[in-house]
């Protein structure tokens, strides 16, 4: 008797599935702006929306936004809950598909992008490095003229006003981005509640991320006179002051969007 082949179990656990239209718009726009050239260079750029949740909105929107910079991009939504995959199937079309799976990333290609938003919040901090390594190992490798695929892992509030994410390449973590709707912000440290799992428990004295948010609040307070020109101008002035002491990697074009990106090494946990 021939043994019946078994399908490996997906790696990971079911998330709450909370999602909303446009929840991940800030992350999508950042990806399109900073990773668009890599996507255009790829022969078959596949992006994975990992853990898209109870409805397929974020995968649908990711495809639309990526195609503004890479018209041949494709998106595969991956969910560990079979019922969510079945519910998303009617939304499939050219360039958009849905698959049952988890951190193993059940696509034949090495993806140019893996987006994992609000997935790791339910995991222990000690599990993050292993998940990152597994996902980075699935990315398209670096090559001549290419830095390889990109993993974007982070957390946001329910309607996407406040978001913090880590960007990683095949080699590991690169940067941390803080993004917000500026009108919703009282002070930059309000973003602390949306730190990704690798950092949220490190927002304590003695840790780099705590020092960064402390300095950001001080720069924000010092920039108070710019508030008369609007929250955007105040944010931009505060970020400009931050660059004196912190390795900010972006510039005014991204700051105007309510963003600031810092090298991972500057914020990485100690010990």
Predicted regions span which residues?
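Class I SAM-dependent methyltransferase Rossmann-like catalytic core
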Residues: 1-45, 49, 54-56
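Conserved acidic residues
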Residues: 45, 111-112, 149
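Class I SAM-dependent methyltransferase SAM/SAH-binding core
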Residues: 48, 53-106
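A short SAM/SAH-binding and catalytic strip from SAM-dependent methyltransferases
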Residues: 111-129
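A short glycine-rich, Lys/Arg-flanked "PGG" loop and its adjoining helix->strand segment in the class I
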Residues: 121, 129-148
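A conserved mid-domain beta-alpha-beta active-site/ligand-binding segment of alpha/beta enzyme cores
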Residues: 164-234
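Conserved Class I S-adenosyl-L-methionine
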Residues: 210-271
């Amino acid at each position: 008797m021939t043994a019946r082949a078994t399908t490996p179990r997906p790696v990971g656990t079911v998330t709450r599935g909370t999602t909303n239209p446009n929840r991940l718009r800030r992350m999508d726009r950042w990806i399109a702006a900073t990773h668009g050239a890599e996507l255009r260079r790829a022969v078959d750029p596949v992006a994975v929306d990992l853990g898209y949740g109870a409805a397929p909105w974020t995968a649908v929107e990711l495809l639309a936004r990526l195609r503004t910079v890479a018209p041949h991009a494709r998106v595969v939504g991956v969910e560990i809950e079979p019922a969510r995959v079945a519910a998303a199937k009617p939304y499939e079309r050219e360039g958009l598909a849905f698959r049952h799976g988890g951190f193993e990333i059940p696509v034949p290609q090495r993806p140019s992008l893996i987006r994992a938003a609000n997935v790791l919040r339910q995991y222990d901090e000690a599990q993050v490095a292993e998940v990152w390594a597994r996902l980075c190992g699935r990315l398209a490798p670096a090559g001549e003229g290419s830095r390889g695929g990109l993993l974007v892992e982070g957390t946001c509030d329910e309607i996407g006003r406040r978001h913090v994410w880590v960007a990683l390449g095949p080699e590991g973590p690169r940067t941390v981005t803080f993004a917000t709707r500026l009108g919703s912000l009282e002070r930059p440290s309000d973003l602390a509640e949306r730190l990704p799992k690798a950092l949220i428990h490190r927002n304590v004295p003695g840790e780099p991320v705590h020092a960064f948010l402390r300095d950001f609040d001080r720069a924000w307070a010092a920039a108070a006179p710019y508030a008369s020109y609007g929250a955007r101008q105040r944010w931009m002035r505060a970020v400009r002051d931050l660059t004196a002491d912190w390795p900010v990697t972006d510039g005014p074009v991204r700051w105007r969007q309510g963003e600031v990106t810092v090298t991972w090494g500057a914020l990485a946990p100690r010990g």
